[in-house]
Amino acid sequence: MIKTQQRLITEFQKNDREMLKVQIQTFRGQEYVDIRAWIKDESSGEYKATPKGLPIHVELLSELMAALEKAALVLDGARH
């Protein structure tokens, strides 16, 4: 069995049933930033991970951050 280590960075509510979690995961010796949707289980009230997510290798993190900053600038410009 392969162990995955997880460290929660932040989580925030997306809507009444879903939250997004940002975690650092180590899998087979490689580190990833995992951004994933978690959905509330109606019977237990606990949140469970969904397949909807994006594991990002740490080497690509700076590129993703730059792309998100560009998207924010475009959206900000569209609002003014």
Where are these regions (language model features)?
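Negatively charged, low-complexity tracts enriched in Asp/Glu with abundant Ser/Thr
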Residues: 1-16
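Low-complexity, intrinsically disordered regions enriched in charged/polar residues
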Residues: 2-3, 18, 29, 58
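Intrinsic disorder/low-complexity segments enriched in polar/small residues
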Residues: 6-7, 24, 70
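Generic structural "secondary-structure junction" signal
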Residues: 11-14, 29, 41, 56
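A short, structured beta-strand/loop element
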Residues: 19-52
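Mixed-charge, Lys/Arg-enriched low-complexity segments
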Residues: 50-80
